[in-house]
Regions:
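Extended oligomerization regions of viral-like shell subunits
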Residues: 150-281, 287, 310
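Short helix/loop capping segments that flank catalytic or ligand/cofactor-binding pockets
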Residues: 68-71, 109-110, 194-197, 292-294
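Protruding loop/beta-arch "assembly-hinge" segments enriched in small, turn-prone residues
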Residues: 4-30, 40, 47-50, 271-310
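A residue-level signal for conserved active-site and pocket-lining positions in enzyme catalytic cores
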Residues: 60, 121, 283
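Generic recognition of stable, solvent-exposed alpha-helical segments in well-folded globular domains
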Residues: 29, 39, 55, 112, ...
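Assembly/oligomerization interface modules of large self-assembling protein complexes
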Residues: 16-97, 298
C-alpha cells in the first residue's frame, strides 16, 4: 500500500512553483548547469585537482618522501626504508549569494527561476572562490596560494630581470629548486598585452592565445576575471597545481527571503535595500566548497613592479 505514495520529492520540487517551495535544493539540471559555469569561470578550479566531498571534512594521505631502492647482490639482504606521509584535512565552507528579484518570480517555477538566475549565481560563486583561494580575500580558509608562496619567500618583483619572460623563468626556477615542475600559471587580464609582445630568439611568440586554452612556456595560463584578482599583490602566479586541492559537496541549496534588509545592496538614496518596502524578495543560494594547498614550495608569485618584499 505504501508504494502508492512513493512520490519523488525532488521531481515535485523541481516542477513546482517557487512560492510553494521556499527552501530546498536548486533543481538538479539547473544546479549542474551552475556548477558547470562555475568550473568554467573559476581559474582555481580549472587548474587545481578537484575532489568530491561526501561530508564537510575529508582527509588525504600524501606521501612527502617515498621509500628508497637499493642495489643488492645475490646473497645480500635488501635494506628497508620508511616512507614519510602527511594527512592534511580539508574542510568545506559554506559560500552564499543573495540575489533580489521581484515578487512576481514567486509565481514562476523553480526550474525557470534558477535557469534565469544561473549566470548571476555562477559568476558570484566563481569570483568569490578565486579571490579566497588565490589571495585569501574574505576567505574562511587558513591558507591561500599567495600566503603559502609568501610564507617561504617564493616571490620575485616584476622588472627584476630584463623582461617579463625572464622574470617568469626565474619564478619557475624557485619551484624547480624544490624538485617540482610548473604545470600552469594564473594572472590578471591586464598582463595579456605584455605577454603577446614576448618573442623567443627566432621571433616566435612565447604566449599562445588559443581558443580553448592559452599557454605560456608550453603550460596553460588562466586569466582571472571579474575583479577576483588583486593587482596590488601579484602580476602572475606560477605553480604545480597538483598540490592545490579543491573539494566540492554536491547540491546547491536555496532559501527565499521576504523580510530581510540587504546591506550589500544600496538604493538611490544610499540606504540598504529593504525587501518588504520595495515589494521584492531575495533568493539566497549556498554551496559548500573546501580548499587546501598541500605543498607550499609548489607555488611562486610575481609581485607588481615597485612592490617591497619584507
Amino acid at each position: 500500500m505504501s508504494k502508492l505514495f512513493n512520490i519523488n520529492l525532488q521531481l515535485f520540487a523541481d516542477s513546482g512553483y517557487l512560492k510553494d517551495n521556499l527552501t530546498g535544493f536548486v533543481p538538479t539540471e539547473q544546479a549542474a548547469g551552475i556548477m558547470k559555469d562555475v568550473a568554467r569561470g573559476s581559474s582555481i578550479l580549472r587548474l587545481s585537482k578537484v575532489e568530491p566531498m561526501k561530508s564537510d571534512k575529508k582527509k588525504f594521505s600524501i606521501m612527502t618522501d617515498g621509500p628508497g631502492a637499493y642495489w643488492v647482490g645475490e646473497t645480500e639482504r635488501i635494506q628497508t626504508s620508511t616512507a614519510q606521509w602527511i594527512f592534511p584535512e580539508m574542510e568545506a565552507k559554506k559560500l552564499g549569494v543573495i540575489i533580489p528579484v521581484t515578487k512576481e518570480k514567486l509565481n514562476d517555477t523553480t526550474i525557470n527561476v534558477f535557469g534565469e538566475l544561473r549566470p548571476a549565481i555562477a559568476e558570484a560563486f566563481y569570483k568569490a572562490i578565486d579571490a579566497a583561494c588565490l589571495f585569501g580575500t574574505n576567505s574562511p580558509f587558513t591558507k591561500s596560494i599567495l600566503s603559502v608562496a609568501d610564507g617561504i619567500d617564493n616571490e620575485i618583483v616584476d622588472g627584476t630581470a630584463a623582461s617579463l619572460d625572464l622574470d617568469v623563468s626565474d619564478l619557475m626556477a624557485l619551484i624547480e629548486d624544490g624538485g617540482l615542475d610548473v604545470n600552469g600559471f594564473t594572472a590578471h587580464y591586464g598582463i595579456k598585452n605584455r605577454l603577446r609582445k614576448l618573442r623567443d630568439s627566432n621571433g616566435n611568440q612565447l604566449f599562445v592565445n588559443g581558443v580553448d586554452q592559452k599557454e605560456f612556456y608550453n603550460n596553460p595560463i588562466e586569466f582571472v576575471r571579474n575583479g577576483a584578482w588583486d593587482k596590488t599583490k601579484a602580476e602572475l602566479i606560477a605553480g604545480n597545481w597538483n598540490y592545490s586541492l579543491v573539494g566540492i559537496r554536491a547540491g546547491i541549496e536555496y532559501e527565499i527571503l521576504k523580510e530581510a534588509t540587504l546591506h550589500t545592496v544600496t538604493m538611490g538614496d544610499g540606504k540598504p535595500l529593504a525587501l518588504a518596502e520595495q515589494d521584492m524578495v531575495a533568493i539566497k543560494a549556498t554551496m559548500r566548497i573546501g580548499f587546501l594547498p598541500i605543498k607550499d614550495e609548489a607555488f611562486a608569485v610575481l609581485r607588481p613592479s615597485g612592490f617591497v618584499i619584507s
